[in-house]
Amino acid sequence: MSKITFPKDFIWGSATAAYQIEGAYNEDGKGESIWDRFSHTPGNIADGHTGDVACDHYHRYEEDIKIMKEIGIKSYRFSISWPRIFPEGTGKLNQKGLDFYKRLTNLLLENGIMPAITLYHWDLPQKLQDKGGWKNRDTTDYFTEYSEVIFKNLGDIVPIWFTHNEPGVVSLLGHFLGIHAPGIKDLRTSLEVSHNLLLSHGKAVKLFREMNIDAQIGIALNLSYHYPASEKAEDIEAAELSFSLAGRWYLDPVLKGRYPENALKLYKKKGIELSFPEDDLKLISQPIDFIAFNNYSSEFIKYDPSSESGFSPANSILEKFEKTDMGWIIYPEGLYDLLMLLDRDYGKPNIVISENGAAFKDEIGSNGKIEDTKRIQYLKDYLTQAHRAIQDGVNLKAYYLWSLLDNFEWAYGYNKRFGIVHVNFDTLERKIKDSGYWYKEVIKNNGF
């Protein structure tokens, strides 16, 4: 097989999120987040796990940066815990929380690692949830206030910014299915939440521009390609609708200033029509510097008149594929097709893959190594498709591998390992897996 080489300025990174790695949930003045409350409620998280300690990154960030340097990570994408900065979501600033992120950012820079900050990765201050959370439009203003503090303190040294991580997951899993914090199960609420998340993105981008910050800003969506189960018109239409609800519902407002028609029509049929000031979409769709997405898998969709939405997963197709430990199918071509779709339908934007990776059951072997060959194969296959898209003219600028560390995988607790670095959750000892050493070579050679 011929060698695959990426463009010379391609950014090789890895990613984490505050609640999944930091621990120190009640230290140095940090306020309670909705994930603290949710994980402390029995029955919400597998095995009663919580993020109270997680990887203890809050106390071990120096060691973690050493590991990044050893692997050769060029850029590290991390999120800031809003309740560390504003324990009540608004009002009194917690200087100790801010100082932690300043130390972290400066140490990354000293080690030649480019910091990339996500402003919101799901850990809303509980005090704001008590006032209605993301369903309450006021939260978008509190978010702007919080963003301003971060921009003021880190804007001149951080080159890459993400407003939100996966608003679709916050809306769907947090407010419709109720399996993520804050555990609400209501369709109308989930749609109002999705709108307010996007509105807060727009407000933060507007502020970022007004502050003349010399850096790039975008948003990280969760996207997968939705394939029709067959060439029948009804399956094709079902897959298009499914992708509209999960993908275009976020892509279109941000990049086109409107919601997709087929999705609006479906919600109208269910008796739900969103009402909001007409300026909202103008705010939401301000120009961004790149569109980012997290991609792990693909969907196969069939027409299903018995389902509420008129479609369902094509299980007979899905069962043919190899799956990761999350039960997600491994289908690398889906990444290529998704990149081509974004390039074609949204005017050749700059694109960042903000997360990609796989969970497998990793164990330290008798030789002391973690031989995660399945993960290496997964990464190789997905990166091959990313490279293929670049060859075909897609403006893909960066790749952030999920994740640097094994961590708290939300409702699954510590049972799903995504890291290229193994974490023993009893001793908190870190150990680079074979995939970490493989990634080191990829970065060094700018390909494989």
UniProtKB/Swiss-Prot annotation:
- Could you tell me one molecular function GO term of this UniProt entry? beta-glucosidase activity
UniProt cross-references to Gene3D superfamilies, sorted A to Z = Glycosidases (3.20.20.80)
The record's catalysed reaction(s) read: Hydrolysis of terminal, non-reducing beta-D-glucosyl residues with release of beta-D-glucose
> Can you supply a Gene Ontology BP term from the record?
cellulose catabolic process
Q: Which GO terms describe its cellular component?
A: cytosol
Q: Which Pfam families match?
A: Glyco_hydro_1
Membrane-crossing segments per the record: none
The family database entries (InterPro entries) matched by this protein are listed as:
Glyco_hydro_1, Glyco_hydro_1_AS, Glyco_hydro_1_beta-glucosidase, Glyco_hydro_1_N_CS, Glycoside_hydrolase_SF
Q: Which UniProt keywords apply?
A: Carbohydrate metabolism, Cellulose degradation, Glycosidase, Hydrolase, Polysaccharide degradation
What are its E.C. numbers?
3.2.1.21
Give the enzyme class.
hydrolase
Pathway named in the protein's UniProt entry = Glycan metabolism; cellulose degradation
Catalytic machinery residues: 166 (proton donor), 355 (nucleophile)
Disulfide pattern: none
The family this protein is said to belong to = Belongs to the glycosyl hydrolase 1 family.
Protein known as: Beta-glucosidase A
